[in-house]
Design a protein with these regions (language model features):
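ATP-binding Walker
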Residues: 8
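Post-Walker A helix-loop "phosphate-sensing" segment adjacent to the P-loop in P-loop NTPases
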Residues: 18-27
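Conserved phosphate-donor/acceptor-positioning beta-strand/loop module used by diverse small-molecule
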Residues: 90-95, 104-128
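NTP-dependent small-molecule kinase module
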Residues: 124, 128-132, 146-194
Length: 194
């Protein structure tokens, strides 16, 4: 799992990770929010109505789901189960609340936390994105402060102070995890002790 506050650069890191490791399966989240400019159905999210989302949630169709800033987001269970059954590695890009739910349901899931170099830089990124009002940005920054406190819950942290460097570090983490799996548990990934 790749998690971190809104605006930290998760989407950009995921794009670079998938370019470097094209065999990695990306879990596409479902959401009730409207698409942002340059977001495509089925590529960035599955954009669904509230009724359809609620049906999926009630039927156990999500590995996790949450209300975030007045919209619902969820990780559909079936595509992940199918990919894992076929022996493929799955990447889930998610918020902190969702990562906690997934970890509770799937304790073997490996959690990478992406953090900004500072809250000031995070605010700059959110404003540059141009898709939220001032009120929404203030809400996202308040939530980010809470989420940053969750960093010790994650297996490893990557500071996104330079996108290319952060993306390269995440690629290296995935490579090490794959080697650990292949080599029977031997890894040089420095993990936090929980």
């Amino acid at each position: 799992m790749l998690a971190g506050p809104s605006g930290v650069g998760k989407v950009a890191i995921v794009a670079r990770l998938l370019a470097a490791l094209p065999d990695l399966e990306l879990s596409i989240s479902a959401t009730t929010r409207q698409p942002r400019p340059r977001e495509d159905e089925g590529r960035h999210y599955h954009f669904v109505g509230r009724g359809k989302f609620d049906e999926m949630a009630e039927a156990g169709g999500f590995l996790e789901w949450a209300d975030i800033f007045g919209e619902r987001y969820g990780t559909p269970r079936e595509p992940i189960d199918r990919a894992l059954a076929e022996g493929r590695d799955v990447l889930v890009e998610i918020d902190v609340q969702g990562a906690r739910q997934v970890k509770a349901a799937e304790p073997e899931a490996y959690m990478v936390f992406i953090t900004p170099p500072s809250l000031q830089e995070l605010e700059r990124r959110l404003r540059t994105r141009g898709s939220e009002t001032d009120h929404q940005i203030r809400g996202r920054l308040a939530k980010a402060s809470e989420e940053l406190a969750a960093e010790p819950e994650f297996d490893v942290t990557v500071v996104n102070d330079d996108l290319e460097t952060a993306a390269r570090e995440v690629v290296e983490i995935v490579d090490r995890l794959r080697r650990r799996t292949i080599n029977g548990g031997h890894s040089r990934v420095k993990e936090r002790k929980h």
